[in-house]
Amino acid sequence: MKVLILRPAELLSETIRRFREEGFDAYGCPFIKLIYTDFDVPEHDFAIVTSQNAARVLRERGVRLKRVIAIGKKTAELIEAEEVLLPSKFDSETLYEEFAEMLRGKRVVAFRSNAGSEAVKRLSEVADFREIQVYRIEKLQGEEQRREVEKVREGFYDAIVFSSSMIARSLLELCDEKCLEALKNIFVVAIGPPTAKVLAEKGIRAEIPEEYTFDGVIELLKSKKM
């Protein structure tokens, strides 16, 4: 099965290797780039880390936190902290639903990108909430990306994995009608409901893995026996 994996360059080679170890003919392309920014760490009772990219930045800068809520097991593994909690589903909406009461009246700081979900920001309704932008996301739409879109148009891939809503938007902006039709006829995976929603706006039905991780994607693809 030829699988196209869309995720930032910093994490792409590791993911491709993992898929190939599982027997997939894996390819990859970054449709976004990450631009890291300077930031300070304010006093807080709880920290929220929403991605592996944010966790990696904190680790590289030697930031040690106390109590952390992390989105994703891989994110949690990268964090230096006394305690790390995880929502039952690895998305911002579930984090809000499950931890809002715990965070009520607390000082909460969220380390994230400029393109994060609005759900986390709703914590400002119950907590002394601050958002720290540790990196910005910009779309990549150069020659490399256009070549991949052409391969999608021509039916080269059996499956494509979108790992974020921004990545989905970046690719879709390069898609003509033939590309959109091709996406409707291959197996599309979205890691999480927000990404699936972006694809659905263009009439593309995406499957969502039970666990919003690349391990979950692998299990989903294996279950389809394509």
From Swiss-Prot:
Name of the protein this chain belongs to: Putative uroporphyrinogen-III synthase
Catalytic activity: hydroxymethylbilane = uroporphyrinogen III + H2O
Keyword Lyase included in the entry's annotation: yes
Similarity-based family: Belongs to the uroporphyrinogen-III synthase family.
Involved pathway(s): Porphyrin-containing compound metabolism; protoporphyrin-IX biosynthesis; coproporphyrinogen-III from 5-aminolevulinate: step 3/4
Organism: Archaeoglobus fulgidus (strain ATCC 49558 / DSM 4304 / JCM 9628 / NBRC 100126 / VC-16)
Source organism superkingdom: Archaea
EC number: 4.2.1.75
Classification lineage: Archaea, Methanobacteriati, Methanobacteriota, Archaeoglobi, Archaeoglobales
Reported function: Catalyzes cyclization of the linear tetrapyrrole, hydroxymethylbilane, to the macrocyclic uroporphyrinogen III.
UniProt-recorded Gene Ontology molecular function terms: uroporphyrinogen-III synthase activity
GO biological process: protoporphyrinogen IX biosynthetic process; uroporphyrinogen III biosynthetic process
Pfam families named in the record: HEM4
Enzymatic class: lyase
PANTHER family, per database record: BLR5956 PROTEIN (PTHR40082:SF1)
UniProt KW keywords: Lyase, Porphyrin biosynthesis
